[in-house]
């Protein structure tokens, strides 16, 4: 029966010795996000009124990383088992709310499965998430009597007969707050590990005549935990495969689903094509008929209809209007804006710069802190010199300007509409509309010039 209120406890106190890392295990990332953040997000989406995070090792790192989440931090100074961890959180439980127990190193648990578990919890009983494995070695076995769940026996404490059981405990369960506190108070550490097992509450509930409802997840990967980097890498591939499948079924053409990484959220239009080894980070929006070439990285950007991004380009915190062309090997840094039909070619870098409608920067240029008008040509090797060693300054270029190759624009500077900047010019003062500007060392010719001889 579903209570209106529910709190979630996430166990995240483990050190993660087998990760061989200074980083707490639950902060290692899957799809660009800390494992524990996946679990927190699921809890919040499920409607948790409070999320209690039980921590131990690396508390400062955890708190700093998760500072934007509304968490109740619960210290487990000694790691004496899952039951002990829940005992630390128990003082915060309300009697009339449900308590859902999750794990910070089980990142792929789905909201849909958790909702089914919550719905299945009997009044006064326990909802328990279980799975059946061909090889259940090392896992706690589910014991039943006449089909009813009677308890969980940890592998080290199980008899030979019990070790033949294939149904195992995932560790995820839900119960009423008052019941949970009462059962937690009765736990002992009289077992092979000398720890307090949360699983012992199943037998306590059964002895009280309470019902235990077992629910199975849709996919085994939902309940797979991470103890080492190999397991984490496998779950990463599972997750990416699932995301790629969803995108393909929604109409996105992934040329090789096995070589696509989604590390955030992708919103897309129709007939989008994505080549191999593309990485999507953060929140990305792709319009209709967008094409992304091989090896591109797109992060927190909006890309308009009919844009074409050539291979090995990096686009971060940028906004592209329709029909823009990028790359190959272009870099759009935060604050880059391209108006309709603009072109940024190979080895061009933009940062906090706007390139106007139909304007082009074809190759080998740096455009930083700049406002560039419509139908402007930026020649190869153009640099907006925006930094004087202490402060940044802006370059403003009007419509229909032609900037020749190897030009330096020393900001702050404004170039008027229709102006022409000759190749090799260093612009240090404002340029009026329709002016021609050039600054060059006079070209000298010396007939019969002899090169210096090399010393032997």
Swiss-Prot record:
Keyword Cytoplasm listed? The answer is: yes
UniProt entry keywords in alphabetical sequence: Acyltransferase, Cell shape, Cell wall biogenesis/degradation, Cytoplasm, Magnesium, Metal-binding, Multifunctional enzyme, Nucleotidyltransferase, Peptidoglycan synthesis, Repeat, Transferase
Q: Which Gene Ontology CC terms are recorded?
A: cytoplasm; membrane
Q: Which residues bind UDP-N-acetyl-alpha-D-glucosamine?
A: 11-14, 25, 76, 81-82, 103-105, 140, 154, 169, 227, 333, 351, 366, 377
Binding residues annotated for acetyl-CoA, in chain numbering = 380, 386-387, 405, 423, 440
Q: In its keyword annotation, does this UniProt entry include Acyltransferase?
A: yes
Q: Where is this region: Linker?
A: 230-250
> Any idea which GO molecular function terms this record carries?
glucosamine-1-phosphate N-acetyltransferase activity; magnesium ion binding; UDP-N-acetylglucosamine diphosphorylase activity
Q: What class of enzyme is it?
A: transferase
Q: Where in the cell is it found?
A: Cytoplasm
Q: Which GO terms describe its biological process?
A: cell morphogenesis; cell wall organization; lipid A biosynthetic process; peptidoglycan biosynthetic process; regulation of cell shape; UDP-N-acetylglucosamine biosynthetic process
> Under which EC number(s) is this enzyme classified?
2.7.7.23, 2.3.1.157
Which reactions fall under this protein's catalytic activity? alpha-D-glucosamine 1-phosphate + acetyl-CoA = N-acetyl-alpha-D-glucosamine 1-phosphate + CoA + H(+); N-acetyl-alpha-D-glucosamine 1-phosphate + UTP + H(+) = UDP-N-acetyl-alpha-D-glucosamine + diphosphate
Start and end residues of each stretch annotated as N-acetyltransferase? 251-456
Identify the residues that bind Mg(2+).
Answer: 105, 227
Give the pathway: Nucleotide-sugar biosynthesis; UDP-N-acetyl-alpha-D-glucosamine biosynthesis; N-acetyl-alpha-D-glucosamine 1-phosphate from alpha-D-glucosamine 6-phosphate (route II): step 2/2; Nucleotide-sugar biosynthesis; UDP-N-acetyl-alpha-D-glucosamine biosynthesis; UDP-N-acetyl-alpha-D-glucosamine from N-acetyl-alpha-D-glucosamine 1-phosphate: step 1/1; Bacterial outer membrane biogenesis; LPS lipid A biosynthesis
Q: How does it assemble?
A: Homotrimer.
Q: What HAMAP family is this protein classified in?
A: GlmU
The text of the family note is: In the N-terminal section; belongs to the N-acetylglucosamine-1-phosphate uridyltransferase family.
Briefly state the protein's biological role: Catalyzes the last two sequential reactions in the de novo biosynthetic pathway for UDP-N-acetylglucosamine (UDP-GlcNAc). The C-terminal domain catalyzes the transfer of acetyl group from acetyl coenzyme A to glucosamine-1-phosphate (GlcN-1-P) to produce N-acetylglucosamine-1-phosphate (GlcNAc-1-P), which is converted into UDP-GlcNAc by the transfer of uridine 5-monophosphate (from uridine 5-triphosphate), a reaction catalyzed by the N-terminal domain.
UniProt-recorded name of the protein: Bifunctional protein GlmU
Q: Give the species this sequence originates from.
A: Citrobacter koseri (strain ATCC BAA-895 / CDC 4225-83 / SGSC4696)
Native organism taxonomy: Bacteria, Pseudomonadati, Pseudomonadota, Gammaproteobacteria, Enterobacterales
Q: Gene symbol?
A: glmU
